[in-house]
């Protein structure tokens, strides 16, 4: 069944879980996006590299579940899994994509993939943002770009993981 069909089945009399959905490639490009959950998915560029939709590439074929906490405090339960996409020509390599699906944490009990997650453990929450340019987390070790709306000093005498990370 198509994900779009499952997420659109919102009968006002029998509302379902409002999911979000995204598909990304190994370069971080978002090729499909849909959100009823309220999570903001970037329209241009990639999403936060800490989203589990990206870490799914490190364990192909395995469903990974996580509790993600946005900078505004909203919590989401997210699952991600890689899939191979064939091009149909002989000798052509298949491309690897990652599919992310999630909902607000308040629906976690209705989402089968959360049964092994400890939703009360604050330490297991994965702090994420929308994207590096819009994220308030200045201490993020995976920051790839400076934030647009905050003053961000780059220390040329210090070397971190990237230009924007000085640890």
Predicted regions and their residues:
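Extended amphipathic alpha-helical segments with heptad-repeat/coiled-coil character used for oligomerization
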Residues: 11-39
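Short microdomains enriched in Cys/His and/or Lys/Arg
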Residues: 143-167
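Conserved small/polar residues in nucleotide/adenosyl-binding loops
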Residues: 1-5
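Short linear motifs in intrinsically disordered
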Residues: 9-13, 57-58
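Phenylalanine-focused residue identity feature
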Residues: 19-21, 34, 57, 111, ...
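Low-complexity, glycine/alanine/valine/leucine- and proline-rich hydrophobic stretches
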Residues: 39-142
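Residue-level marker of positions within ordered structural domains that often coincide
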Residues: 9, 140, 145
């Amino acid at each position: 069944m198509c994900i779009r069909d499952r997420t659109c089945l919102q009968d006002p009399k029998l509302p379902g879980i409002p999911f979000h959905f995204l598909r990304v490639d190994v370069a971080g490009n978002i090729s499909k996006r849909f959100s009823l959950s309220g999570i903001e998915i970037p329209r241009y560029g990639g999403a936060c590299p800490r989203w589990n939709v990206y870490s799914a590439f490190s364990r192909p074929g395995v469903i990974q579940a996580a509790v993600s906490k946005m900078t505004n405090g909203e919590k989401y339960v997210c699952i991600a899994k890689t899939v191979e996409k064939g091009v149909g020509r002989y000798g052509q390599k298949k491309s690897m994509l990652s599919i992310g699906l999630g909902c607000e944490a308040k629906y976690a009990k209705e989402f089968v993939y959360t049964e092994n997650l400890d939703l009360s453990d604050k330490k297991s929450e994965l702090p994420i943002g929308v994207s590096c340019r819009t994220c308030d987390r200045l201490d993020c070790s995976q920051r790839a770009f400076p934030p647009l709306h905050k003053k961000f000093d780059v220390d040329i005498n210090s070397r971190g993981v990237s230009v924007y990370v000085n640890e």
